[in-house]
């Protein structure tokens, strides 16, 4: 096998070495400055007013502030969930419940790269583990 160019044929290499961002670039991660609790179909601040910071282990930079739920918040969330289950969810036919669960799984798959990047930023784990194991397994739990 010859490694020399064929006589009379010029090899022209493109000198534009610009690339798109890597699929695992942190640019895909849209992280808000603060996250509240999701209770009864809406986002609400914690009753205590307390938040904790989540930090990136790799850079030690703050990613976001997360609402810190206390007993009253947990009680409100459980009460809302119980009410939703007893009055709505349990009355839906199984096929309809399955459609909702399937849609959640599909949304998780559609946003898998974003979730994997955020999980790796937050937990410090290798992107390959988040991307190839954690997020696909989380979505798989919702498939009906």
Residue ranges: model-predicted function:
Residues 1-65, 99, 103:
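Terminal low-complexity tails and localization/encapsulation signals of metabolic enzymes
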Residues 59-144:
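Glycine-rich loop-to-alpha-helix module at the N-terminal edge of alpha/beta enzyme cores
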